[in-house]
């Protein structure tokens, strides 16, 4: 993997850039790329696309950067861009969390990708069905977590099409007229028109769904794991840097 860049072009207060530093980094990236080709290893580069994003958005906002307040350590949005690029390189674009389509008039599941749709019932204007997904949506964190971090994961949506390409849990229902209230496990999620439901809605963007809440639980567990890991790492750093005998 070609590393994320050193941002020489962002305008930061009291932070003079080291000119040509990213050129040096790119020479290392090129060496990695050549080595990967020689050994038939897979390779993807984060440096060039992240630099391109930085420079694109700096045309309107010279203080924009994915690389944090020190030009080199990405903020939360930068880490999400790295994850997006890494997954894209593995062919993850277009992989649905789930994709389901129901014909309300026929009480029939037309499509059920990466999920199971069953027990479809229509009683008057009410439509119900059982839905079991094989994956959870990705819950984009809206909090700037981590020491010194100023941006949240969710800010990644301003710069890459993460939701459209990698985080779609599509519900499409045809044959409905008027407005319909969607409930999952008796939890009201929202109200959509028959036309909107026929076009399809992305449940991964709805934070009140039970599956989104399950995904949040996993996210918080992972944050807890990371805090434990960071604590041990920082302890080892302090022990090495300050407590060893000189």
Q: Language-model segments: what does each one mean?
A:
Residues 1-5, 23-64, 80-98, 179-181, ...:
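Extracellular serine-dependent O-acyl
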């Amino acid at each position: 993997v070609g590393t994320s860049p050193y941002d020489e072009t962002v305008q930061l207060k009291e932070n003079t850039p080291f000119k040509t530093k990213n050129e040096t980094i790119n020479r290392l990236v090129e060496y990695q790329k050549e080595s990967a080709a020689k050994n038939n290893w897979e390779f993807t580069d984060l440096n060039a696309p992240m630099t391109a994003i930085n420079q694109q958005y700096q045309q309107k906002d010279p203080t924009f950067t994915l690389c944090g307040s020190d030009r080199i350590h990405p903020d939360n949005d930068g880490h999400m861009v790295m994850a997006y690029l890494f997954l894209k390189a593995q062919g993850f674009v277009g992989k649905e969390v789930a994709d389901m389509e129901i014909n309300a008039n026929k009480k029939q599941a037309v499509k059920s990708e990466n999920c199971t749709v069953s027990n479809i019932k229509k009683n008057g204007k009410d439509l119900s069905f059982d839905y079991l997904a094989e994956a959870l949506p990705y819950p984009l964190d809206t909090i700037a977590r981590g020491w010194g971090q100023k941006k949240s994961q969710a800010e990644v949506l301003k710069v890459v099409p993460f939701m459209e390409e990698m985080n779609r849990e599509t519900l499409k229902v045809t044959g409905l007229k008027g407005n319909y209230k969607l409930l999952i496990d008796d939890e009201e999620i929202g109200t959509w028109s028959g036309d909107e439901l026929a076009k399809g809605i992305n449940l991964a963007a709805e934070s009140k769904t039970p599956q989104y809440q399950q995904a949040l639980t996993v996210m918080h567990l992972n944050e807890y794991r990371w805090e434990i890991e960071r604590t041990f790492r920082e302890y080892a750093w302090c022990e090495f840097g300050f407590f060893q005998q000189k």
